[in-house]
C-alpha cells in the first residue's frame, strides 16, 4: 500500500474504493475495506504488522467500501453513520451487492474464489457496524484523533475522516479524482455543501474514494464538475427531455467521457451517471 504520510497508508490502484489505515501509538484504525478478498486479507495482515486493529470505519454503504469487512471479523470495532448502518449490504431490485462483488472475482481476483463465502455464510456475519451515530463523531486512539465528519451527498451517511496529527483527510467518495464521478442516487446539492465544509480542514493531503491521493485543490475540481453536471441536466430538462432521454443524452456527450470510469466499472456507466 502507498505510504501517504508517516502513519497513513492507502491503496489507490485496484478495483474498488481506496481503503486506508492509520498507525497510532495504541493500535491501528482501518478506513474502508477492499472489495477483493485477497486484497482484504493482505491489507489486514499488513495493518496488523503495525499493531492491533482497534477500529474499522466505513465511510459509506456501497459494496466496494464494505464487502471486505467480512475478512476483518474479530479485528476492531466497526464504526459507521446510522444511514450507512441501515443500508449495509442491502439487496434492492436494482442490485444485489453480494452478487456485484462476486462479479469481480474471475477478472480481478481469481485467487479470491478460494476464500469466497457462500451467500448464506456471508450474511450470517458480514461484520456490520456496532458503533452507530448521527452527525459527527471524534474517536481518540493513542496519539491520534479521528474526526468523523458527516458529509452527505454521494450517499446519505457519507463520512470523511480527518486526522489532524497527520494533516490528512480520508474523504471517501466525496472526491473522485481523475475518474468518472458515481452519481447514482446522490443528492448533488448536499454533496456541494459537504465539499465546502471540507475546504475548511487544515490538510496537506486527501485520500479520495477513487483515484490518486490529492490535495484540497481537488475539492474545487469536484465541485466544478458537479455544478457543470447540474447545468447539463437543467439544460436537457429545459429542452423537454424525459429522465431517460436526459440520461441517454449525457451518456453520449463529451461531458460523460471526460474521465474514464474507474477500474472494473465500465459496464456500470448507466448507474454512474444516472
Residue positions per predicted region:
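Metallo-beta-lactamase
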Residues: 28-29, 35-37, 138, 145-229
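Divalent metal-coordination and catalytic microenvironments
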Residues: 7, 22, 32, 47, ...
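Accessory terminal helices/loops
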Residues: 114, 200-202, 213-274
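Residue-level detector of beta-strand structural context in well-folded domains
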Residues: 18-20, 131, 135-137, 159
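Short loop/helix-cap segments at secondary-structure boundaries that form the rim of catalytic
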Residues: 23, 69-74, 141-142, 162
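Conserved beta-strand hairpin/beta-sheet module of binuclear metal-dependent hydrolase folds
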Residues: 2-48, 160-172
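Active-site HxH/HxHxD metal-binding segment of metal-dependent hydrolases
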Residues: 41, 45-134, 138, 231
